[in-house]
Amino acid sequence: MQIYGWKVQVRGDTLSEMELNLNYIVDEVVKRLKCEEKDEGILVEASGRHVHLSKEAVELLFGKGYELTKKRELSQPGQYLCEERVTIIGPKGTMHNVSVLGPERQETQVELSKTDALAIGVNAPVKMSGDIEKSGSVIIATAKSVLKLDKGVIAAKRHIHITPEDAKRYNVVNNEEVNIKVEGERGIIFTNVAIRVSEKFNTVVHLDYDEANACGFTKGMRASIVK
């Protein structure tokens, strides 16, 4: 017999055996059909300049015992935008109203685009979030206090947060680097995109504003993994 164009043979000496084999064939056909469904790609998000603050930094900048105020949830579970804003000061310029993201981190980190870093005269090496060794320095200020950050300024390496299920689906593993293709008027292929796999993640591509501008980013844009 043929099912959706595939020629299959149902084997078995008894009716029950034939029914079991047929059920297996139907399951396999369903799996194949799912694999052949058009992949809509992975949602792309653009991340602007922001800071992650340690508990010590929060208390220095806002006061003893101060707790960050959640404004809205972000795409990754447990991550959120705060009501608080800070000023970033470099040798060549100042950036006001910079977002603070919660919750508190073990170490303070400032994420800028390369354009931002150039504008205020700071070094922002391309690194994964959390890797602040040999990174740039900057001053973080509020109306209450000033923090001189000796290290912690980075340009975040473009990456994909991905669930284990989606990692298996796309045949990628944690810490692997892939290429992604973004379609559109300014379609582009980004290389060296890091894979970060965790059950705690939602599957999303994260670009900074320089990268987002390069591909003509619009809300709802999607990217496909190219190997």
Predicted regions, residues:
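Short, low-complexity, charged amphipathic interaction modules
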Residues: 6, 12-37
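Short amphipathic
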Residues: 40-51
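Short beta-strand-centered segments at strand-helix junctions
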Residues: 50-91, 96-143, 148-175, 179-181, ...
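Acidic, glycine-rich active-site loops and adjacent beta-strand->loop/helix elements
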Residues: 184
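Short coil-to-beta-strand transition motifs
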Residues: 187-189
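C-terminal edge-of-domain segments
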Residues: 224-227
